[in-house]
From Swiss-Prot:
Inhibited bye p-chloromercuribenzoate and salicylaldehyde. Activated by salicylate. The keyword Lyase applies. This is Trans-O-hydroxybenzylidenepyruvate hydratase-aldolase. Keywords: Aromatic hydrocarbons catabolism, Lyase, Pyruvate. Optimum pH is 8.
Amino acid sequence: MARTLMKPDDVKGAWAIIPTPAKDDASDWRATKTVDLDETARVVNGLIDAGINGILSMGTLGEAATMTHDEKLDFIKALVDAAAGRVPIFVGTTCLNTRDTIALTRQALDIGADGTMLGVPMWCAPSVDVAVQFYKDLAEAVPEMNIAIYANPEAFKFDFPRSFWAQVAEIPQVVTAKYIGVAHLLPDLAAIRGRIKLLPIDFDYYGAARMDESIDAFWSSGAVCDPLVTTTLRDLVSQARATGDWSAARAFMGRLGPTAAPLFPNGSFKEFSTYNIALEKARMNAGGWMNAGPVRPPYHLCPEPYLEGARLSGRMWAELGKALAAEK
């Protein structure tokens, strides 16, 4: 049976981006079948029960670059089975070339994933023409698969310029994008003309929502440190939109914002990107809501002071979650 594609307006609220839970031996290159499938199911159910609107997976912190093909298929099946159609599940299928990406995306579709979170092949830094054609080819090959563009310039050696957004907005399968920063948000929104729902990170959501009414969804890796923090942000911004009173949302950002600082070594996104996986998993493990497990090689090495900053970030997020629960 043919599936109906999502529309940008179908993407709303708080979307959690999750790690791929790893078994205890996952940092050993000899390890096989490293995905903790039981923890995967528990996390998906916990996020849905907490009110999360959608789930993104198998990005950078999701270790798509270091999972085996069989592990990816096992993880996708665990995600889809646990969600059971209750929220959209987008899975990363980016590979180093178009044909492998198409093959994995077809397999994800057959398993039941709702969409792919798709970056661009990065062995050679892509030109705009190459990047746009990559998405066009994927949409032609797997026309029933929704696409979330994974716009991470550090990971993919690509700046995702305005000319790129203007062209991919013409692809019906491209319904949303995991978006970073707000410096270019307004011109990028003008380029996409309402055809793609841009998702800023949780720390930018308040500011982005104040800038443009179309910003009514965001992504959050902190959701797996405690989803109550993420859903509280969503609900406070929604209430502010309804009432015109942004004071509570602004005050909440004063509590949420400081949790980000320790995550970024020397305040640098570039430095963070070098150790992204190890830092995010350290943060999540310290948060205590889930067991993200160890990091798969070769990205399991990270300076200890950087890891301690990430752990502090996770503990701060978790403490905020406990405070919010006590205030209810």
